Amino acid sequence: MTGKQEALQATPSSAPVAAGPGTSVTALLKAAFKPLASLRLTIVCLACAMFIVFVGTLDQVQIGVYEAQLRYFKSFFLYFTLPGSNFRIPYFPGGYTLGAVLLVNLIAAHLARFKFTWKKSGILILHSGLILLLIGQLVTSIFEEESQIQLDEGQTKNYSESPYFDELAIIDQSKPDSEEVISVPASRLIKGQTISLPVKGLQLQVDESYENAALINPNQLPSPNYPHLRLGPMAVAVAIQKTYKQNERNQPTAAVTLLKDGQAVGSWALSSGFPQPVQFRIGSDPFEIIFRPKRYYRPFSITLEEFKHDRYAGTDIAKNFSSKVRLVDPSAHENREALIYMNHPLWYSDLILYQAGFGNNDKTTVLQVMKNPSRLLPYIACGMMALGLVIQFGMHLVSFVRRRVIA
């Protein structure tokens, strides 16, 4: 018995300390956060981040910048898809997971080890700026909205369109002064699904769906029985591999049946590559159905009054291109002209409109529309980090000078 007691007493430090009356809450919190504050965890996360940046940069050559961001940086895990199936196996942490762990690690390090003194105020401000930068990036990746407005001279629009996503829109045209739009994202159009619409009694039945399709003449089909969807007398859609190229866009296509109280209203084959509205009626009310790029409606309208494309003398190299637009917002009593050109965007409300491109022999402009609720956070975070460095090194410099003077 004595030998056993001595053995137990020889290693008391390895056992967790029970909270006694004299144990402070701060000490308990520090003990709880200590494993999360590990420097090894920081190094592992940074090494993993370097790996996904390296692999994602290489892979974006094949799948494009946008898809690489979704797979590697705007995801919780990287997945491996088993050949011949849709079963996905996570094999590596993604950007969201690494960012969250680094954020928790940084906060835990402060709670477990940091003791606030004026001499360390610079470090506190510096790390607070880093935390704000991580939070700002997370908010941006979740809530950022990117779209485009394509305008011909004299044309007016009150919406922008997504360059990546499409929607199936059912438009109620029964009211003379407005339209009610029911939109279904293309990602929800899965074969065999029946989607309930936010209008009483309406359902959308998906009979067939292609993630991407090529539109060809019916005479180009390998055989009459080759799987296809007929869009019209001179066009059919055949399924092809989804594209990830930067200069190409997928053309999702679907065959759908609209149901009203369980009864078929009509069946159509629709494609975003053939965005022609199909008109029909429910009772006496006129409707349209169309497959088109996803739209973001705005409280204002914008009109292209003039587009200019300046070139360097004797060449076709673009020197500058600009759009003179008129912005009208009745809700804000706004009616003014604005000039948008390279590196000179238009800021309005929570949107930024950039000059992005042109077409149609310099008669059409393409404006990039960005909505980012956290666009100021990176500036604030970088300012805090710079201030923290200045304060911290300033204190060390003052202390060094004082020691030199005394010596």
Predicted regions and their residues:
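Membrane-anchoring signal-anchor transmembrane alpha-helices and their immediate flanking context
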Residues: 2-148
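A short, highly charged, low-complexity intrinsically disordered segment
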Residues: 10-14, 401-406
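Generic, ordered loop/turn and secondary-structure boundary motif
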Residues: 34-37, 42, 59, 74, ...
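Internal alpha-helical transmembrane segments
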Residues: 40, 90-177, 368-403
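Membrane-proximal extracellular juxtamembrane segment immediately upstream
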Residues: 62-89, 93, 339-400, 405
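Soluble non-transmembrane domains of integral membrane proteins
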Residues: 142-372
